Amino acid sequence: MRSSAKQEELVRAFKALLKEEKFSSQGEIVVALQEQGFDNINQSKVSRMLTKFGAVRTRNAKMEMVYCLPAELGVPTTSSPLKNLVLDIDYNDAVVVIHTSPGAAQLIARLLDSLGKAEGILGTIAGDDTIFTTPASGFSVKELYEAILELFEQEL
């Protein structure tokens, strides 16, 4: 089998496994892929694939922390349904705090990081459902707060 065909098959199998929402560790994903005949797979390859496809750890229906894929692959945009995952945006003298649906903070932070300094974002720190965002030089926290509100079309 051609290597690109084998790679496509690996990607399909990888995505199918993550859709099952039952793998809590990279090692479990490695074993599952090896059982499907992907003998060359190892933890570092799985780690790279998780990053490449934007996989996040979130709670499944059984409240277990598992790896899953976001609804949309690639860098999300503010026109995607991701803006519906933002529950609240607030700020203080130092940071803008964004509260999201459980498991959505990393996706929203990825969107904000992709916008970067041009929108006034120096960087983000994301947990499971909370994001801290700090303004870039030349931007106040209030200006960043207003820019983020505008991105997600929420009321002041």
Curated annotation (Swiss-Prot):
Pathways per UniProt: Amino-acid biosynthesis; L-arginine biosynthesis [regulation]
Q: Has the keyword NADP been applied to this entry?
A: no
Q: Which UniProt keywords are listed? A: Amino-acid biosynthesis, Arginine biosynthesis, Cytoplasm, DNA-binding, Repressor, Transcription, Transcription regulation
Q: Which cellular components does GO assign to this protein?
A: cytoplasm
Name the InterPro entries on file.
Arg_repress, Arg_repress_C, Arg_repress_C_sf, Arg_repress_DNA-bd, WH-like_DNA-bd_sf, WH_DNA-bd_sf
Instruction: Select a single GO molecular function from the record's annotations and give it.
Output: DNA-binding transcription factor activity
Tell me where on the tree of life, at the top rank, the source sits.
Answer: Bacteria
- Please state where this protein is localized: Cytoplasm
Task: Please give the start and end residues of each transmembrane region.
Answer: none
Main location, first listed in the record: cytoplasm
Q: Which one Pfam family would you cite for this protein?
A: Arg_repressor_C
Q: List GO BP terms, alphabetically.
A: L-arginine biosynthetic process; protein complex oligomerization; regulation of arginine biosynthetic process
* Job of this protein: Regulates arginine biosynthesis genes.
Q: Which PANTHER family match?
A: ARGININE REPRESSOR (PTHR34471:SF1)
Record HAMAP family: Arg_repressor
Q: Which family does it belong to?
A: Belongs to the ArgR family.
Q: What is this protein called?
A: Arginine repressor
